[in-house]
Every structure is written in structure tokens, then in C-alpha cells.
Swiss-Prot record:
A zinc finger (NR C4-type) spans 10-30, 46-65. Disulfide bonds: none annotated. Residues 7-82 bind DNA. SUPFAM superfamilies: Glucocorticoid receptor-like (DNA-binding domain), Nuclear receptor ligand-binding domain. The keyword Membrane does not apply. The lineage of its organism: Eukaryota, Metazoa, Ecdysozoa, Nematoda, Chromadorea. InterPro entries: NHR-like_dom_sf, Nucl_hrmn_rcpt_lig-bd, Znf_hrmn_rcpt, Znf_NHR/GATA. Belongs to the nuclear hormone receptor family. Keywords: DNA-binding, Metal-binding, Nucleus, Receptor, Transcription, Transcription regulation, Zinc, Zinc-finger. It comes from Caenorhabditis elegans. This is Nuclear hormone receptor family member nhr-108. GO terms for biological process: regulation of transcription by RNA polymerase II.
Length: 338
């Protein structure tokens, strides 16, 4: 995979490197990133203007820019292909991560089509648009992403339903946070945005603008948005997940335990799959972080922050119904009560 070079900075992130890997001077982490992307053949989503800063402390911020820089400095796809044995390639395709990447790619493609994201100009999202968008997106998630988990299940349909119902809202909250890494606003699955500092955009009337009920809704619910924002900024954003880590967390969320109405067989299957996911996550972090045990703990710690966010959503949903506030019919509120 590599040959020795003089002590030079990695041409992707600037980390000190002693090797030429896949045709260019690069550190071990960037070379492994490049290899994984070539082997998996998964689409790399682009959520930026193509000019992200990729210093050694920020190289995981944007996969798209990192991959393009790998190509720009001369890293060769054909070298990866020529050095990947047939049996190794087959083994990689059978990992949970590779299956998750393909399923998530299908979900993103379906969103491109349904929401016309390639031609859409992002805008602030009103509460009614937010409700409509999540109602559509939940169906897309069920069809294109949850299908992967169910394909690995030996459970009866009612137990698959228990897991998928538990998964939907947690996945949606985690994904919105993941899309917001390094950005000042929350980016929704249809590419519209929510800015916590401009909640009037959320609660205003879709056609006429401001109205009294919208103002009341904003005043009452603002603290819930702020509580959620604090959790994100202090516990989630600093971890700076990459897409693979995000997908591993998705798997841990789906194969959870202690869920209401979960059968003994379902619990055993979830524990078995979680063990496999954690094994893959640990191996993944070993190739990226010298202190990989700490990184694994940081990634898994996001699940606790996610539970805090879920609690905030449940409370705001209850308040919205009691006071008949705008947004009370949001599908995410309904999902927290199932």
C-alpha cells in the first residue's frame, strides 16, 4: 500500500507523513479513508460549496472535499483496486457498514427525487412545511433505510414494527444533528433550514406572515429549542462524526434493548447485532485514531445526548397539545408517543 518518503506533511490534511500511499504523500488516516471509499463504491454526499478547510484537526468535517482532495493530489483509484484481493473485497461487502452505506445512499437518492433537492433553493422552513416534510420523509426512511435492518431480521413482523417505531424519531433527530456539523443552521432532509435564532420563521403564517398564535407558540416553545441547541453544541457537535460513525450509531439505535413490547427473542437478536456493530466500530476507529478507545466512547456517548434531545421533544409536544400551539401535529411528536 505504501513506500517510504521523506518526512513530509500529508497533502490532504497536513499531518506528518513518512509514506507515499496510493500514489501521493498522505497520512495513514487519509489513505485508509480513500481506500474505504473506493472499495465501498458508496456515493459521497456533498453538503458544502467545495471549499472546506481540511486541516489535521478538521479532516473529518467534509467527506466530499476530503475525497476530492485525495484525487486532486494524485491518489489513484486503480491502485486501490489492484491491491484489494477478491476474497477481501467480498468480505468487505458483507460488513454491516457497507450495507448501511448502500441503504443510506438509496435513501438519499429517493430524497433527491421526491424533494427535487438538486434544483431546490434552500429556505427557512415554516412549521406546516416541516410537518409535511417529515410525514413524507418518514415513509422514505421506512422504505429505503429500515429495509436494510429488516433484511437481517429473523423476527416476526410485529417485533420488526417495535424496532422501526422506536428507531424513526431517534434517527431523524440524529440525522438533522449530523447534517448540522460545522454549520450555523439545521439542515433538513429536503435541504430547507431552521435557525434557532430566527424561530419567527418557523411559527409565522405560511401565507400572511406573522399572527398572534404564531407569536405565542414561539414564546412558549423557544426554551425547548434553546435546550436542544445547548445539548447539540456541548455534547454532539464537538464529536464531529463522520458518515461511517453516524451510520454505526444508526445501527445501535435500531438494535436497541429495553424497548417497550420487545420480546425475548428480539432482545437476543438485538444484543447479538449490537456486538457485531461495536466490533466493526472499534476496528474502524483503530484505523483512524491512535486513541481509538476514547474515540469509541465519544461516539457512543452521543446516544445519551440523543436521549436528552428526545426528552425535550416529548415535553414540547405535550406543551404544544395542551396549549394548542402551532406545530402540535408534527409527525415527530406523534412518534414519541407510540
Amino acid at each position: 500500500m505504501s513506500k517510504k518518503s521523506e518526512n513530509q506533511p500529508c497533502m490532504v490534511c497536513g499531518e506528518i507523513s513518512y509514506s507515499i500511499r496510493f500514489g501521493a504523500v498522505s497520512c495513514r488516516a487519509c489513505a485508509e479513508f480513500f481506500r474505504r471509499k473506493i472499495v465501498s463504491k458508496a456515493r459521497i454526499p456533498k453538503r458544502c460549496n467545495g471549499a472546506c478547510d481540511l486541516g489535521k484537526y478538521h479532516r473529518k468535517t467534509c467527506q466530499s472535499c476530503r475525497f476530492q482532495k485525495c484525487l486532486k493530489i494524485g491518489m489513484l483509484e486503480k491502485v486501490v483496486a489492484s491491491r484489494t484481493p477478491v476474497n477481501r473485497r467480498s468480505e468487505n461487502n458483507q460488513t454491516i457498514l457497507s450495507g448501511l452505506e448502500k441503504a443510506y445512499d438509496k435513501l438519499e437518492n429517493s430524497r433527491d427525487n421526491v424533494f427535487d433537492r438538486k434544483n431546490k433553493i434552500p429556505k427557512y422552513c415554516n412549521h406546516q412545511e416541516l410537518d409535511d416534510m417529515f410525514e413524507i420523509d418518514i415513509k422514505l426512511i421506512s422504505t429505503h433505510f429500515i429495509q436494510f435492518f429488516e433484511s437481517k431480521s429473523s423476527l416476526e413482523n410485529n417485533q420488526n414494527k417495535v424496532l422501526s417505531t422506536h428507531f424513526i424519531i431517534r434517527f431523524s433527530l440524529l440525522e438533522v444533528a449530523f447534517r448540522a456539523f460545522g454549520k450555523p443552521t439545521y439542515i433538513l432532509p429536503n435541504n430547507d433550514i431552521i435557525d434557532v435564532s430566527k424561530l419567527d420563521k418557523v411559527y409565522q403564517h405560511l401565507e400572511t406572515g406573522e399572527d398572534e398564535r404564531g407569536k405565542n407558540s414561539q414564546v412558549i416553545l423557544q426554551r425547548f429549542w434553546q435546550m436542544n441547541e445547548k445539548t447539540m453544541k456541548t455534547e454532539v457537535f464537538p464529536v464531529n462524526l463522520d458518515q461511517s460513525e453516524f451510520l454505526f450509531l444508526c445501527a445501535l439505535i435500531y438494535w436497541d434493548f429495553g424497548i417497550e413490547n420487545q420480546s425475548e427473542k428480539c432482545l437476543e437478536e438485538c444484543q447479538r447485532m449490537r456486538t457485531q456493530v461495536l466490533k466493526e466500530l472499534t476496528e474502524y476507529e483503530k484505523s483512524n485514531y491512535p486513541e481509538n478507545e476514547l474515540r469509541v466512547a465519544q461516539v457512543i456517548g452521543i446516544l445519551q445526548a440523543l436521549q436528552k434531545t428526545l426528552d425535550v421533544i416529548q415535553h414540547s409536544g405535550y406543551i404544544s397539545n395542551v396549549y394548542n400551539l402551532k406545530g402540535k401535529q408534527c409527525p415527530l411528536y406523534e412518534a414519541t408517543n407510540e
